[in-house]
Amino acid sequence: KHTQAQDKQNQAQDKQNQLGFFLMFVFAVSGFVASFYLTASDAVSAKAALSSLIANSYLANAMIELARLALALIVAGLIAKIVIASGLVQQKKVFVTYIEPVNDFFQRYGWSLAWLLLALIGLYRISDIVMGVIANVFYLDLGFTKPEIASVVKTFGLIMTIIGGFLGGLLSIRFGVLKILFLGALLSAITNLLFMLLTQVGYDMTLLYVVISADNLSAGLASAAFIAFLSSLTNISFTAVQYAIFSSLMTLLPKILGGYSGTIVETIGYQHFFLSTALMGIPVLVLIVLANKRFDIHRLEKR
């Protein structure tokens, strides 16, 4: 009877913690969104004032938006602390769920290597994502119709991405994850240069097929190797949380920069924009080389 009563008490405590986690998430996200919404009008005034002060509207916009992001994160964090202090969720449970997986990552790899790996994760897809944000607008500007874009870019491109994913998986098994990770990053950067050629040629369905084939094939290959790489970094005890953190970090900076793709194109044009996205891949290649020298990927793959 004592065991049954204890089990029921534990189940009730687990349900309370689950409800607490849910409420903490809802309140924190609501605070995050509300922070952006309530600061929208003030942000416009701040951008105008800062733009006149530093004589650079693009930099002023970026600085104000980063400040709004920081403020929203602080608000979300404070709300989470209030929920914890209220007793809706146990602080120990929050530590085990969110803090311990992060501590585990830094303890296993050490601070210097851990930051190197996080930098690699955060920058690996930057070339593809920043370019991809403006891709559809680019196709329309060249004169391609929406049905043509849907047929070539979406349908045919998806097929090439799947093929690239299979190829990336097979090559990772055969030659190792980091080698294919490097190859994927290199090809992703190089294929962005093909869009420069498409800019010069203009409307050409054959060339569009060639460019999409190369771009999506390399993207699929890189994605497969990257997923294998992320999986090898996680601890089996914290797989879900650590992988979720890595996946979020993977798109954070690229998505932020991608939001300014249109402004960049208006400023420097498509040719220089595609060149700049290709050059963004160079630091990634350097990080992969450094990571390869610092830890044994084969040991991780066998773990």
Task: Tell me what each language-model feature is.
Residues L233-T267:
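A late C-terminal transmembrane helix in Major Facilitator Superfamily
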Residues I163-I180, V265-E266:
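Helix-to-loop junctions at the C-terminal end of transmembrane segments
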Residues K1, G220-T239, I245:
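Intracellular juxtamembrane helix-capping segments at the cytosolic ends
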Residues A46, V130-Y139, F226, L230, ...:
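Hydrophobic/aromatic end-of-helix segments at the C-terminal termini of transmembrane alpha-helices
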